[in-house]
Amino acid sequence: MLFFFNWWILALLLPIEAVTGLYILTVGAGYVCLLMGGLWMSRLLKHNLMDDVFNNENESFMQETRLIESEYSVNLPTRFYYKKRWNNGWINVVNPFRASIVLGTPGSGKSYAVVNNFIKQQIEKGFSMYVYDFKFSDLSTIAYNHLLNHPEGYKVKPKFYVINFDDPRRSHRCNPIHPDFMEDITDAYESAYTIMLNLNKSWVQKQGDFFVESPIILFAAIIWYLKIFQNGKYCTFPHAIEFLNRRYEDIFPILTSYPELENYLSPFMDAWLGGAAEQLMGQIASAKIPLSRMISPQLYWVMSDSEFTLDINNPEEPKILCVGNNPDRQNIYGAALGLYNSRIVKLINKKGMLKSSVIIDELPTIYFKGLDNLIATARSNKVAVCLGFQDFSQLVRDYGDKEAKVVMNTVGNIFSGQVVGETAKTLSERFGKVLQKRQSISINRQDVSTSINTQMDSLIPPSKISGLTQGMFVGSVSDNFNERIEQKIFHCEIVVDAEKVKREEKAYKKIPVITDFTDGDGNDRMKETVQANYRRIKEEVKQIVQEELERIANDENLKHLLQQK
């Protein structure tokens, strides 16, 4: 005001000396005020602390830029921010046998950016493979076509197998309780345990309870009975369900007529002979009710015969096996597929086998018995495990707190897209803290005071993990003695060549028809064939029960079992 708007002083009706003096005074005072204001403004502008409101510079760090490739590695190209510019880098999973977890909310890009690359690169490097495909046939189509296009990584070309309950035409048949792969009754118990806990996931938290163990033991006894009866001719999962659904007055005499099962079933026999009919009915119902949900002609078709074995990493007969679930029927199909999981884990986790990969998409939709043990021991047997799910709370809910913690704490490689809440906090703690610079400015009329200090703070805070955009991932990898990775932690965008992926997908072939149900006249007989198989199994079990009861009745040492009814 004094400097720019004092022209009106010249128009005052005062002596010229007074006007001149007043004008000079206001111009001088205005000039001094202008200088002081400019000085104060320069202090504020010079020390603008709001340029980096999200602390991006402090929380950016140098990441791995080398490509470290080996016969086992999975390598993902990346872009990361550091020192005010974007840099190219690599995520090198040089030891996939220490297991990998891929986390992220729906749409974060975990399958597109990570899981798909694991499948493709491991097929190129000659891995046998087991893929649990929750949204069939997304991952299965990738595995099938990549095997067609890249068979050169294998000494013996693997065969491709698929389990698909929705469409028997495009499914192989496999009996998960094949008698040749059960050595003693503990194998039968593990199969019964797996199927029951998949059908009743709340039982995971109640293991050891009376009404949890009773149905498991009963169903295990039935499986083992079918294994020893006529050398396992009828030892299939559908036959076991049908046998369970016969009258208990017929079941118990038959089972207890075998010395191997007599002690196993003694609690049930005590309840029967002691007149505790209600208790016995409750125990049997605990097994019958959940298993009855699995009575399906299509499921019976797939699980009642074996076109291949589950030793997928057999060096002489390597396999790539994809099993497909359906989100609309995940509870039923997941229980059956859990049985394949448990058998495969036991068969592949052995010395002297081919390197193999187990890829599980949406892990919480299936109960994977022995998962913690597989992660802990598979490294020495060249089994690479890759688990995809949304966050740790799902794992705690479906696997229990103890097993979930073991899985979370023993995995060597972790990828995480956007996650929130406790999962984000857990990951932030895992990535640790780093020394960060802090600057504070104090401005007053006389002086400017600047304070600079350092303190340890989260390298990747939970808020950053909660706000990751699609395709951005944080995580860490493990290394080897001869393949050292100094900077194991990453916070980057995983680069995917979208155009290349589109071209590949456009050229993909559908999984072919495996079983042709067309008759000589060109009519589709799938429904009739599947139904005939369903009726055959029911009739075979009915015949087994009838023959066994006649055997017991004609045996002087056993006929007392029938008289107890």
Placement of each model-derived feature along the sequence:
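Basic- and hydrophobic-enriched, low-structure N-terminal and domain-boundary segments
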Residues: 1-108, 112-118, 443-445, 461
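Low-complexity, polar-biased intrinsically disordered regions enriched in Pro/Ser/Thr/Gly
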Residues: 80-87, 200-210, 438-455
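Ordered hydrophobic segments in well-structured contexts
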Residues: 60, 73-75, 322, 472-476, ...
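P-loop NTPase motor domains
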Residues: 46-54, 91-384, 399, 465-484, ...
